[in-house]
From Swiss-Prot:
This is Maturase K. One of its GO terms (molecular function) is RNA binding. Usually encoded in the trnK tRNA gene intron. Probably assists in splicing its own and other chloroplast group II introns. One of its GO terms (biological process) is RNA splicing. It comes from the Eukaryota. Keywords: Chloroplast, mRNA processing, Plastid, RNA-binding, tRNA processing.
Length: 520
């Protein structure tokens, strides 16, 4: 892989236009074959894959040669002469998967080359890989916005739309013909209802890696067209007229600019103030876009109309209205990556002292407030059978066959994962409850194993029961739950590279809700 990347870096122009010869590199299909076997071991036993021993690179090359000879027409991998190619039964899908994997490796190389210049200049790129790295950005930018546009990217796309997307990047016609053939072979996977269903079906078909690459290309195409437009909009800021309202001549000019102007300077000042410095801030998770805007409600509706036309005209997709919602940040909360966020209006007392007098004022500020969703966390623990739906702890009878250290380690690991991920929550009372819910099932499981009472288990193992926590982690817990203001600051970690299992469960639940059309 490093060799192909170096070759592409030396001559990116040639790499983009002549990718087809890479498909004949046996190293690529060796990688694809390893990917296929690794996923086969996860979904089915090796005894069921009797055709693995008959794998042939020459057969794969013949398949690709036939695709090239068809002059771009769609080829079915099962329409070969059985006497010539010996490609029968389940071997058809097997070699189809290998061709798809080979294309995936080639596309991954080109995608990494094209997107590498976006990472140049980031000296601390490792810290930006953390999921928590997005929260400080939201904490800094979102309180200054007043509207939030929540968008679900349309993803039920036609294979030809993906081919057209790749044509902007890859100008090698034979590679595009091969890609078109493979995409039509897996058309049912691409035309799934939602992304989670696509990943589920793709896992069964052992093409999850390949489809994730296609999805990344599709999302990158959306971002490459929308983000520059948002940047130009943010840079073209309106002029603030607040400092010039006392001038009569300037007021007359503004009166002609604003359509619904008022004779009262007070009313006019309020209207002009909302036109000051519009801005757009954007974050993404999977197929979900969050766009925070500062401007009028009419401006937000125009952006929603523009995005609807964008997907309809550029990708020939119809975006349903229920997949785009508009929320006012000061009145509504929103969820993202397992957190519940809201923008709260906070007041604090300031004493201003002048030369001859002093007075007290209470300015109002906006504060970004992340909260751990306690109720949904309890629902997830109930689903995993740590408690019932009301939060009453229950024991894990399936773990009674494990050793005491293994049981303690499992409960302790679950608690530390929850605490680590939700360390940025502004309210720690819900995490206290999570610890209580997990501590009692741990004691009940040990009591059931030793056939004793919970009181005996507590006397033996101590009241804490989570004995695997290191001193550094216990210090972090004490700081997180401290009552002083200086020690209750939110903590965002730079080592969280994967989503919490609860976040994935919550995401699936939200997708089921959002797929039911309703009027926003």
């Amino acid at each position: 892989m490093d060799k192909f990347r170096r070759n592409g870096k030396e001559d990116t122009f040639r790499q983009r236009r002549f990718l087809y010869p890479l498909l004949f590199q046996e190293n690529l299909y060796a990688i694809a074959y390893d990917h296929y076997l690794s996923r086969s071991s996860s979904f089915e036993s090796m005894e069921n894959s009797s055709y693995n021993d008959r794998f042939s690179f020459l057969t794969v090359k013949r398949l690709i040669s036939r695709i090239r000879q068809q002059n771009g027409s769609i080829v079915s991998f099962g329409n070969y002469n059985q006497n010539k190619n010996k490609l029968v039964g389940h071997n058809r899908n097997f070699y189809s998967e290998l061709v798809l994997e080979g294309l995936t490796v080639v596309l991954e190389v080109t995608f990494s080359i094209q997107s590498k210049h976006y990472l140049e200049g980031m000296n601390e790129w490792n810290s930006f890989r953390s999921i928590h790295s997005i929260f400080p950005f939201m904490e800094d930018k979102f309180p200054h916005s007043n509207f939030l546009l929540d968008i679900r990217i349309p993803h039920s796309t036609h294979p030809e739309i993906l081919v057209r997307t790749f044509r902007y990047w890859i100008q090698d016609a034979p590679s595009l013909h091969s890609l078109r053939s493979v995409l039509h072979e897996h058309r049912n996977l691409i035309l799934s209802e939602n992304l989670d269903q696509l990943i589920l079906i793709a896992s069964k078909e052992k093409t999850r890696l390949s489809l994730s690459v296609l999805w990344n290309y599709y999302v990158y195409e959306c971002e490459s067209l929308l983000v520059p437009l948002w940047k130009r909009f943010s840079y073209s800021r309106s002029l603030s007229y607040g400092a010039f309202l006392e001038r009569t001549t300037f007021y007359r000019k503004i009166e002609h600019i604003v359509i619904f102007s008022h004779k009262s300077i007070k009313d006019l000042k309020k209207r002009i103030w909302f036109l000051k410095d519009p801005s757009i801030h954007y974050v993404k998770d999977r197929e979900r876009f969050l766009i925070a805007l500062r401007g009028t409600y009419l401006l937000v509706k125009k952006w929603r109309y523009h995005l609807t036309n964008f997907w309809q005209c550029h990708f020939h997709l119809r975006s349903q209205p229920y997949r785009m919602s508009i929320d006012e940040l000061s009145k509504n909360c929103f969820s993202f990556l397992g957190y519940l966020f809201s923008v709260q209006m906070k007041t604090f007392v300031v004493k201003i002292k002048m030369l001859d007098d002093s007075f007290i004022t209470d300015p109002i500020t906006k504060e970004f407030d992340p909260i751990a969703p306690t109720t949904l966390l309890i629902g997830y623990l109930a689903k995993e059978r740590f408690c019932d739906i009301s939060g009453r702890p229950t024991g894990r009878l399936a773990w009674t066959g494990l050793t005491d250290d293994n049981i303690l380690h499992r409960f302790d690991r679950i608690w530390r994962n929850i605490l680590h991920y939700y360390s940025g929550s502004s309210k720690k009372d819900g995490l206290y409850r999570m610890k209580y819910i997990l501590r009692l099932p741990c004691a009940k499981t040990l009591a059931c194993k030793h056939k004793s009472a919970i009181r005996v288990v507590r006397e033996r193992f101590g009241s804490e029961l989570f004995t695997k926590s290191s001193p550094k982690e216990r210090e972090l817990i004490s700081l997180s739950f401290s009552k002083t203001r200086s020690q209750r600051e939110r903590i965002w970690h730079s080592d969280i590279l994967q989503r919490n299992p609860f976040v994935n469960s919550w995401w699936n639940k939200q997708n089921l809700q959002v797929e039911t059309p309703f009027d926003r």
